[in-house]
């Protein structure tokens, strides 16, 4: 059997205010083409199907279209909820969908969902384990010895009687190999704790011939090739730009996994990072429809910099400053300003914009305005 392993679609996601739905539909169309080209006999969706628990209607319509396209092709779908999804909403109409070959495990209610498919060698069991927390597993399995995430997942899997000699796990969790954590990305906005009670050791999956994981946005193996994160099909952050996104084609033979092959994806628009003086960046623009994250090296901030940048690159997403010769600044300025008093922040901003510090009179005026504003708040 050949199946495609996908994860972390994050349908409905916005990146720096940009709606990514058109890009997501483009990449889903490409995935359907890969299904046809490689003769995929199933598609696995390992969680974070949506970006939020209450996704926009257009995102729901897009998922409906994608699932319908797969069902029309008679390609079974095996999906679990992720930490971004509403498990209850994903479970809606799951019984009816199963009759069309779309198997969705939204909530964990005491045991993973087991689905058996067949190929010419016999049965293959897909064990669908949605995103779970230790407290949830403890609620449904009160007699199990659950002390952390690792033991919780172990207890959840232990209740499953193997339904076939060849077994595939579909899960959405933080999985580590011993003390080696996976490589994270900036687009993973949920707090991820690595190497502590919040992670699961890949050794828990020894009874499966392949573990199809979601949660981490960089495609990678965890310890061994058969325990794998598919990664997100699109780049959603600066630190992912330049990375080759893919879906994973897995071939299960008579005795287990025979081949694991990443199939490269080409986005509608790439995310690119440009660095240099503004005048140089906009002088000879190329690939102007790409999403641009710009770091300007001009000595002082320019008031209309973003407008000039978007005149050359309409999809410019973000702009940061790092004057030539200055120490590198974090891309996320939240960390840089956290804990600084208001007066210092305003002084820094004024100096950058005007090339001089505030005078004593101006400092007093700002302080007075701040006090008056605080009374209004």
Q: Which residues are covered by each model-predicted region?
A:
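Active-site neighborhood of phospho(di)ester-bond hydrolases with catalytic His/Asp-centered motifs
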Residues: 6-7, 43-48, 76-83, 103-108, ...
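Conserved beta-sheet core of the metallophosphoesterase superfamily
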Residues: 177, 181-258
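Accessory, non-catalytic peripheral segments of nucleic-acid enzymes
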Residues: 37, 42, 251-377
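Active-site neighborhood of divalent metal-dependent phosphoester/pyrophosphate hydrolases
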Residues: 40-58, 74-88, 174-196
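Conserved catalytic scaffold of divalent metal-dependent phosphoesterases
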Residues: 92-194, 233, 253
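N-terminal active-site segment of His-dependent metallophosphoesterases
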Residues: 1-68, 72, 363, 368-372, ...
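Binuclear metal-dependent phosphoesterase catalytic core
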Residues: 112-125, 129, 227-290
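Metal-dependent catalytic neighborhoods of phosphoester/phosphodiester hydrolases
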Residues: 14-16, 49-66, 81-101, 106, ...
């Amino acid at each position: 059997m050949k199946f495609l392993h996908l994860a972390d679609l994050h349908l409905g996601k916005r990146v720096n205010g940009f709606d990514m739905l058109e890009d997501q539909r483009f990449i889903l169309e490409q995935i359907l083409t890969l299904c046809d080209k490689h003769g995929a006999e199933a598609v696995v969706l390992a969680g974070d199907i949506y970006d939020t628990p209450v996704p926009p209607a257009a995102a729901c319509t897009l998922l409906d279209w994608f699932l319908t396209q797969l069902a029309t092709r008679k390609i079974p779908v095996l999906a679990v909820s992720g930490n971004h999804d509403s498990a209850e909403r994903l479970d809606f109409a799951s019984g009816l969908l199963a009759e069309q070959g779309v198997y969705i495990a939204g909530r964990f209610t005491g045991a993973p969902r087991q689905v058996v498919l067949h190929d010419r060698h016999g049965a293959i069991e897909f064990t669908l384990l949605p995103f779970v927390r230790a407290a949830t597993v403890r609620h449904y399995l009160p007699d199990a010895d659950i002390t952390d995430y690792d033991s919780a997942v172990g207890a959840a899997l232990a209740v499953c009687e193997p339904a076939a000699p060849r077994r595939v796990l579909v899960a959405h969790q933080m999985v580590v190999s011993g003390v080696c954590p996976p490589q994270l990305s900036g687009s993973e906005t949920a707090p991820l704790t690595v190497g502590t009670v919040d992670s699961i050791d890949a050794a828990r999956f020894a009874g499966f011939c392949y573990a199809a994981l979601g949660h981490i946005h960089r495609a990678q193996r965890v310890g061994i090739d058969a325990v794998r994160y598919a990664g997100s099909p699109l780049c959603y952050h600066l630190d992912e730009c330049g990375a080759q996104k893919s879906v994973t084609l897995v071939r299960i033979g008579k005795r287990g996994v025979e081949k694991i092959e990443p199939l490269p994806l080409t986005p509608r628009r790439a995310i690119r990072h440009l660095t240099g003086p503004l005048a140089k960046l906009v002088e000879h623009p190329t690939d102007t429809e790409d999403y641009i994250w710009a770091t300007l090296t001009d000595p002082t901030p320019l008031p209309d910099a973003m407008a000039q940048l978007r005149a050359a690159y309409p999809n410019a997403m973000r702009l940061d400053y790092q004057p030539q010769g200055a120490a590198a600044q974090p891309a996320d300025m939240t960390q840089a300003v956290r804990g600084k008093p208001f007066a210092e922040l305003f002084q820094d901003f004024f100096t950058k914009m005007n090339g001089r510090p505030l005078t004593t009179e101006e400092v007093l005026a700002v302080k007075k305005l701040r006090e008056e504003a605080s009374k209004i708040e």
